Curated annotation (Swiss-Prot):
Domain of life assignment: Bacteria
Keywords from the UniProt entry: ATP-binding, Coenzyme A biosynthesis, Cytoplasm, Magnesium, Nucleotide-binding, Nucleotidyltransferase, Transferase
Residues reported in the UniProt entry to bind substrate: T14, K46, L78, R92
Database matches in InterPro entries: Cyt_trans-like, PPAT, Rossmann-like_a/b/a_fold
Organism for this UniProt entry: Xanthomonas oryzae pv. oryzae (strain KACC10331 / KXO85)
Name listed for the protein in its UniProt record: Phosphopantetheine adenylyltransferase
Subunit structure: Homohexamer.
GO terms of molecular function: ATP binding; pantetheine-phosphate adenylyltransferase activity
Amino acid sequence: MSVANSRTAVYPGTFDPITNGHIDLVNRAAPLFERVVVGVAYSPSKGPALSLERRVALAQEALAAHANVEVRGFDTLLAHFVRQMGAGVLLRGLRAVSDFEYEFQMASMNRHLIPEVETLFLTPSEQYSFISSSLVREIARLGGDVSGFVPASVVEALRQVRESRAQA
């Protein structure tokens, strides 16, 4: 087990897909920590549109400009992943009041599971406060333009998913 380091933060999520809101949060967190680990959760129960490997690759591409940011997939309990990474901070984004109740419950549970780790909430920049991966997936599934919400590589990945489902 690693010792918690307050200079290392884990930003977990499904990132199905990574959005400009996620990227904004990492852009703002990267200068605050020596190391930021973006933990891409396997989450098969959520029925992700993109495979874990694809989500990791898209996040790596989107965040490549940061030398202190690494992207890792994980399929364990978040508390175990955070300890494995030696992190002392768990980053979470809060878009709206509607996110707060869920995030508060998760932070409380994580405090019991990993008491040595603090949860830090960051709010998005205003232009990203309405973006969610689920909305992006739904717009893309229905053939809408998501280019204002995600990087070009994600637009292409979602187009490929839509085409493969149309052929199935």
